[in-house]
Regions:
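A membrane-interface helix-boundary motif in multi-pass transporters
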Residues: 164-177, 368-387
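Helix-to-loop junctions at the C-terminal end of transmembrane segments
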Residues: 61-73, 263-278, 370
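Helix-loop boundary and gating motifs at the non-cytosolic
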Residues: 2-55, 214-255
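C-terminal transmembrane helical hairpin of 12-TM major facilitator-type secondary transporters
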Residues: 279-328
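Cytoplasmic helix-loop-helix junction between adjacent transmembrane helices
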Residues: 104-149
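Conserved MFS/SLC helix-loop-helix module at the cytosolic interface between two early adjacent transmembrane helices
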Residues: 59-96
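Juxtamembrane intracellular "pre-TM" segments in multi-pass secondary transporters
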Residues: 1-8, 187-221
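A late C-terminal transmembrane helix in Major Facilitator Superfamily
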Residues: 338, 342-373
Length: 411
């Protein structure tokens, strides 16, 4: 793979780190709800609370983790985050009461709030430098980074399901072991000082961020995409249940999405890099996502069931995944061009926190929409309208290094 061979040792470390992060995470978390409900006997609302607290402690605190990265550097953030994840997973494996489970999942979420902004912001910064050295568009690096994460998300549940034949504690300890290995690898290989990265001591970064309209517009558009993506876990299960009478086909649809993302991310990004800039890549991706919802909306009045009933859902998953492959690398590539000098970590964290808040609010509204008893096509048409409206939110300004030949200053 030409892109991989051209990467610097630091970029290779960061890409492999994303793979390991997701293997360790997805080996445990997909099985948490079932463990809490069956093995521990928690009520459904308590399980929901626990899962919500984990999401909040991660997405909600990304902006804090980004500030930590800008102030203290990538290495301390990654090492601290990995150490917290090891403790959190080990604790979760032995937790058997509500308060201990909550403490463990808060640590698990806080860990990601530290190491994810560190890795994501440094990958974006290094991708800009890689581009400026003449290796090609930065989106190729970020596409490889996204594909590695998807590969980890695909392999993690397989590892977890295998270990779950022993028990949940073994699965948690295996997840902790993955992060021990990541911790050891970064302690040995991550530079103490990364050339070009300067710690930011000045205050006022959040105030400047809140006045950065192009960046906030991008956050809102990205939040609309994430809200649409979240329908994989909200609207899609209902559609599969309606069409087949069970949710057994969901696992196959999720596997299809993961395999498509792993195998197609780099070719799609290379195609988009030759033809589209950053804004147009995101816009086309959002329109593909909208088309996925529209496919289901068009088919719902026919009320197909069985294998035929799964065809619209499959089309939705395929179009959503294609949109994702355009949106995610382009968004990450655009952030450095909208960022104040020395604040890339803060802005990377804010992208996740702001969009996560949009998903939190929008998911509740989406759930109500699906429960209102409207004509079957209406909820899907409303969901299709959201990505279309998000296109109008995309900033109208110079795209920087979106395509070959463009330039941008590293941050």
């Amino acid at each position: 793979m030409r892109t991989w061979k051209a990467l610097t040792p630091l970029l290779k470390l960061l890409v492999l780190t994303q793979l390991a992060f997701n293997v360790g995470f997805y080996a445990v978390l997909p099985f948490l709800a079932a463990h809490l409900g069956t093995a521990i006997g928690m009520a459904g609302w308590v399980v929901g609370l626990v899962l919500g607290l984990r999401t909040f402690s991660q997405q909600g605190l990304f902006v804090v983790g980004g500030w930590f990265v800008d102030r203290y550097g990538v290495r301390p953030a990654v090492l601290t985050g990995c150490a917290l994840r090891v403790v959190g997973f080990a604790w979760l494996g032995y937790a058997d009461e509500t308060w201990t489970v909550i403490g463990a999942v808060l640590l698990v979420g806080l860990a990601a709030a530290l190491f994810s902004p560190a890795v994501e912001s440094e990958v974006a910064r290094q991708a800009v430098l890689w581009e400026e050295d003449g290796h090609g568009p930065r989106t190729r690096v970020l596409a490889l980074f996204s594909a590695s994460g998807q590969a980890g998300a695909f392999m993690g549940p397989l590892l977890g399901a295998l270990l779950l034949t022993v028990d949940f504690r073994t699965t948690c300890l295996a997840g902790a072991t993955v992060f021990v290995l990541v911790l050891a690898g970064h302690a040995r290989l991550m530079p103490h000082r990364i050339p070009g990265r300067v710690a930011t001591r000045a205050r006022g970064g959040v105030r400047v961020l809140l006045r950065n309209r192009p960046f906030l517009s991008l956050c809102c558009a990205y939040g609309a995409y994430l809200l649409a993506y979240n329908q994989l876990y909200l609207a899609l299960p209902q559609e599969v249940q309606r069409a087949t009478g069970s949710q057994a086909a969901l696992s196959w649809l999720f596997a299809l999405a993961s395999l498509l993302a792993v195998c197609g991310q780099l070719p799609v990004t290379r195609w988009a890099g030759d033809r589209l800039g950053l804004r147009r890549s995101i816009a086309v991706g959002l329109l593909l996502v909208a088309a996925g919802f529209a496919v289901v909306a068009a088919a719902r009045p026919a009320a197909w069931t069985g294998a035929a009933g799964l065809l619209p859902a499959t089309g939705y998953v395929l179009l959503l995944t294609l949109g994702q492959m355009l949106i995610v690398p382009a968004t990450r590539a655009w952030v450095p061009d909208l960022t104040e000098d020395g604040r890339l970590g803060l802005y990377t964290g804010a992208l996740s926190s702001v969009s996560g808040l949009i998903v939190l609010i929008g998911s509740s509204a989406g759930g109500c929409l699906l429960d209102l008893g409207l004509p079957p096509a209406v909820p899907w048409l409303v969901l299709a309208a959201l990505p279309v409206l998000a296109v109008a939110l995309l900033p109208h300004r110079a795209e920087g290094a979106g395509c070959e030949g463009d330039t941008a200053l590293p941050r």
